[in-house]
A protein has these predicted regions:
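Short HxH-centered metal-ligating active-site micro-motif
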Residues: 56-112
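Short, conserved "active-site rim" segments that organize catalytic pockets and cofactor/ligand binding
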Residues: 1-71
C-alpha cells in the first residue's frame, strides 16, 4: 500500500508542476485529441513513446504490446489502428521495435 500511496503522491506533484508551468495544460489536453502519429511499440517499460519522440501527451496515439506485434487476429491492435486512421485521422503509423526485446527473443526461441 505504501508504494501505491507514493504513486499517487508523485502523480499529484507532477500535475502541480505541469499546472504551474502551463495553467491551461489539462484544459487544452481534455478539449481535443488530434495526434499526427500512431505509435505501435513494445510494452517494455524502458521505451515510452512520448519520451522517445520528445512529444507531449496528446501528440501521439499509442498502442503497446509485448514485442510490438501487429497480428491479424489481435482485435485490440486492429481496433486501435482503425480508430487512429478513421476517427483521429493520423497521418503516420510507426511500428517501433527496440534492441534486446524480451518478447521477440521469447518468440524466436520457440520452434513450435
Amino acid at each position: 500500500m505504501k508504494l501505491l500511496k507514493q504513486l499517487f503522491t508523485q502523480n499529484r506533484l507532477w500535475a502541480e508542476q505541469i499546472k504551474a508551468e502551463d495553467p491551461k495544460f489539462f484544459e487544452k489536453l481534455a478539449s481535443q485529441q488530434a495526434p499526427e502519429y500512431l505509435w505501435i511499440g513494445c510494452s517494455d517499460s524502458r521505451v515510452p513513446a512520448n519520451e522517445l519522440l520528445g512529444l507531449l501527451p496528446g501528440d501521439v496515439f499509442v498502442h503497446r504490446n509485448v514485442a510490438n506485434l501487429v497480428v491479424h487476429t489481435d482485435f485490440n491492435c486492429l481496433s486501435v489502428i482503425q480508430y487512429a486512421v478513421e476517427v483521429l485521422k493520423v497521418k503516420h503509423i510507426i511500428v517501433c521495435g527496440h534492441y534486446h526485446c524480451g518478447g521477440v527473443i521469447a518468440a524466436m526461441g520457440h520452434k513450435e
